[in-house]
Amino acid sequence: MFSSLYPLARASLFKMDAEDAHHLTLRMLGAAGRTGLACALSPRVPDAPRTVMGLSFRNPVGLAAGLDKDGAAIDGFAALGFGFIEVGTVTPRAQPGNPRPRMFRLPEADAIINRMGFNNSGVDQFVKNVQAARYRGVLGLNIGKNADTPIERAADDYLYCLERVYPFASYVTINISSPNTKNLRQLQGAGELDALLAALKDKQRRLADLHGKLVPLALKIAPDLDDEQVKEIAATLLRHDIEGVIATNTTLSREAVKGLPHADEAGGLSGRPVFDASNAVIRKLRAELGDAVPIIGVGGIFSGEDARAKLAAGAALVQLYTGFIYRGPALVAECVKAIARGEAR
């Protein structure tokens, strides 16, 4: 029923400010998850199980980080049939993010520009929300740095967040690719990334001993990388035995949206315009990584065929964000069914 009602709901939501609509949707999904209404109204999504990063996924279609930054609506999203949920990005301390307005729809391009800036309630509240959720499927927790933490001390923030979220995560995503936190993408540089991942892997080993379980680490990277940068990142992932990589975050490019309303707004562009760039990075990563490090593909998925294209490029799993906002819950089932059909051939 959610799927059939969504076009009507979207018409109303798209008349609102984009961020206000986002918050309203989160509140509604949070309430639906707490009451069980989401399960009763959601479409049936078939199982298409697989094992990736040592984790068992009900199906390969997940929710990307950013839609639920504080983990406040985990149960509501889970009821929509996602095979896994990723929430965050969370930082050590609460922060308001960048000034509003900071989210803009570009419906002519099936796109969104955002410059949110890791607005969140801080890792302590985040952990409380995660603990309160009833969902027991694969849950990714996405961590970042506070805006006022000098880039030279960024590792301190990531290490602190990793320690706090580790006991509650199926996997932890290291987000170094948001364009909306000053200098954050510098951490994708060879030397900076090598030092950060070395520190995080050392912390992971100690936390695994403490908690009696190894929680995989995944690195989230940008689409705005040249071939040499992708090669360097891949080599660093292999050198440090990082368990996964998420490709990609939003793009700074505006080539595909030139002349459209809001196209000149600062921030990261997501949606259909990032699809090809994301797939190109996935293909380059797969060529460098082989089967050693699984890739989670995200960026511009608006149909089941789009999801299959991500897998064909080299992804093991996919995530939805902007396509989910434009298409609604029906997109989840469509992607799972398309992937299952393709694998059955």
Curated annotation (Swiss-Prot):
Keywords: Cell membrane, Flavoprotein, FMN, Membrane, Oxidoreductase, Pyrimidine biosynthesis. Gene3D superfamilies: Aldolase class I (3.20.20.70). Pathway: Pyrimidine metabolism; UMP biosynthesis via de novo pathway; orotate from (S)-dihydroorotate (quinone route): step 1/1. It is found in: Cell membrane. It comes from the Bacteria. Pfam families: DHO_dh (PF01180). InterPro entries: Aldolase_TIM, DHO_dehydrogenase, Dihydroorotate_DH_1_2, Dihydroorotate_DH_2, Dihydroorotate_DH_cat, Dihydroorotate_DH_CS. Binds 1 FMN per subunit. The keyword Cell membrane applies. Its EC number is 1.3.5.2. The active site is at residue 178. GO terms for molecular function: dihydroorotate dehydrogenase (quinone) activity. GO terms for cellular component: cytoplasm; plasma membrane. Its cofactor is FMN. One of its GO terms (biological process) is 'de novo' UMP biosynthetic process. PANTHER family: DIHYDROOROTATE DEHYDROGENASE (QUINONE), MITOCHONDRIAL, DIHYDROOROTATE DEHYDROGENASE (QUINONE), MITOCHONDRIAL-RELATED. Belongs to the dihydroorotate dehydrogenase family. Type 2 subfamily. Catalyzes the conversion of dihydroorotate to orotate with quinone as electron acceptor. This is Dihydroorotate dehydrogenase (quinone). It comes from Burkholderia mallei (strain ATCC 23344). The gene is pyrD.
